């Protein structure tokens, strides 16, 4: 084995189940993998540990961490061939960390399980949506973390997305969503709301998931839209409204132009809309490009039901 290539799909974070955590666990959440954009990392044999390409410095830092965590000796040359845009709500940091860790581990002949990958990459201690969409693709629901326990949240459910459901992404040119210390500080300022958490759980269990399982896009989309507003209300004191300032009008536009469901991924500013069929997707994408008027980009994507792909050369 002289090289390993890992391709990891982006993810849309659809919301948290319990933002502050009134029970024994905190956060919990759900999200879905999309086939574009993607992070593609290649690791090849080398005497030294080096990296090149977009986000090379971050990939190199991850490689150093995972070598120590997994007890890997020797070098590797890491090439970041493609990178998900950073801080727009598509999970760029997690996917880069997991893909780099998997590439370095596989090059060394190791096949760590998902929890070992997350631990070595230093990911998944708050939200495990990025981890489970990386491993499995599709739509995932995770159960939250116990306070003081440094372990990714357990996977509660995973379902494949229908092949004929399409997703339109609108990524406006705007201030990036929160990350790093600013994100950590934001979570300390949130307050518990048991009523909202109960409504979110009810919506996921009795409408969103049943709608997905029965391939009822109307039910799924309505539940998704309502879920996004409930979650957004919890974060409104932090982000200045139910959605990122640049995202609010775009969510309304998605719904007004025919999306069955729409919302903001993570802290934004990326907005997404779900439709049935490629033709409807192309039409919505064209109309959303007019809404952005050059102030960002729009992409029609498919849902990814496979998760990360690992190719050994």
Language model features by range: what are they?
Residues 17, 30-33, 91, 95, ...:
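Gly/Ser/Thr-rich beta-alpha loop segments that engage phosphate groups in nucleotides
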Residues 2-7, 15, 21-25, 113-257, ...:
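ATP-dependent small-molecule kinase catalytic core of the GHMP/sugar-kinase superfamily
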Residues 247, 265-272:
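Small/polar glycine-rich anion-binding or flexible loop at a beta-alpha turn
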Residues 34-35, 72, 255-256, 263-267:
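A structural signal for short secondary-structure junctions
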Residues 40-43, 259-265:
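Short, flexible, solvent-exposed loop/turn segments with mixed acidic/basic and small polar residues
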Residues 82-106, 126-134, 262-266:
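Glycine/serine-rich anion-binding loops at beta->alpha junctions
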Residues 1-88, 92, 105-114, 305-306, ...:
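ATP-binding N-lobe of GHMP and related small-molecule kinases
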